[in-house]
């Protein structure tokens, strides 16, 4: 009789696998229909599975969800649906983060074949435009793709029914085929096709075009803007009924003010320190004035504080601060007033001493700033209006870029791009510490920006100020073209 050897101890790998399987099974029971597949991405985020309705055949299919992070963007949800009954498949992305405080507008100049390979995050509220091709892609499902991918998908959609069109309407078939060939010629960068302008506009602020450090100013730009009421409805912050209700309330308040102007300060609030309060107007320059406005994030009514500040050897500006008690939104901006000057202004400062970092600096919304030695290019509309020091402005740029663009834990950049970012941040840190010399060039078409002259009223040997004629494009962007004053 042979004895059968009994395994008293299981291998560590088998025991760990059983524990993991049991853990996944217990979590699947507790998740009420959401199952863990056991798969993970590179950062350890689990892939989840849920049974969902197929909109093609009406039976149940499987949706897989992965919450992950784009290294220099933000969190997203990648969704993949598969129906075993009819074979229907679909992939899309959804932003996992909240709707941003402001909308975003990206502009990319596609000048070579590599630019077509840039990653693009297109949320469900974003629209895309290819200006030279006269193409606009409306808001639809979210996508993680490339510039070429957007055009290729459009070509695939147009090509689907071409054979049918050829037999029904040959003229229409020929027009669509010519257009498809034209788009393909742009993708292949054939002669006389590039550059091409690609615009990505997202009122929710959750879209993005890949940026590469060290690019010239005209190549890539990102501006933020305050959403309109219609855009707030589009992104789902408020409903159409709520918008109409608020408009009716505003019309009622306006009618009450017209009927009884002396009671206008009482409409909407009991706060006596509004800008319209006659007792406070006398001390307008000495006290902080408060008025009610709509929050750009949640559209609820909130208070905005403002105070005029006179900058020596420049002009008076208005510092504005908004705080919303409903959603917690906060913003601080500087507005320059007065008449629009005939010319723009370019200020160039050579910083050769650490003391230059303590100079006051006013950067208006229309001002662009370039530091060639650091390969830093700040576009118009970026950072908004700021009244701070040169060190404070550079530190803000460093903190925002580091938190958004470069992370050590979730980095999918290629080695060349990563090396450029590391070099860029190293130079920027040295500049903030006053260890390197650099040149600041501020260009404002409205001449509303300023750098402190520490030698005032005498000229500053390290600073030059020159006025220049605005271009036709700048006048057009600022709304100064074809103005009728009569």
From Swiss-Prot:
GO terms for biological process: 'de novo' protein folding; G2/M transition of mitotic cell cycle; protein folding; response to glucose. Residues 1-31 are annotated as: Disordered. Disruption phenotype: Leads to misfolding of elongation factor 1-alpha resulting in proteotoxic stress, accumulation of cytosolic protein aggregates, increased expression of heat shock transcription factor HSF1, and inhibition of protein synthesis. Inviable. SMART domains: Zpr1. GO terms for molecular function: protein folding chaperone; translation elongation factor binding; zinc ion binding. A zinc finger (C4-type) spans 54-86, 295-327. The modification Phosphothreonine is found at residue 407. Belongs to the ZPR1 family. The modification Phosphoserine is found at residue 23. One of its GO terms (cellular component) is cytoplasm. This is Zinc finger chaperone ZPR1. Interacts with elongation factor 1-alpha. The gene is ZPR1. The keyword Lipid metabolism does not apply. Acts as a protein folding chaperone for elongation factor 1-alpha. Present with 39900 molecules/cell in log phase SD medium. Keywords: Chaperone, Cytoplasm, Metal-binding, Nucleus, Phosphoprotein, Repeat, Zinc, Zinc-finger. It is found in: Cytoplasm; Nucleus. The lineage of its organism: Eukaryota, Fungi, Dikarya, Ascomycota, Saccharomycotina.
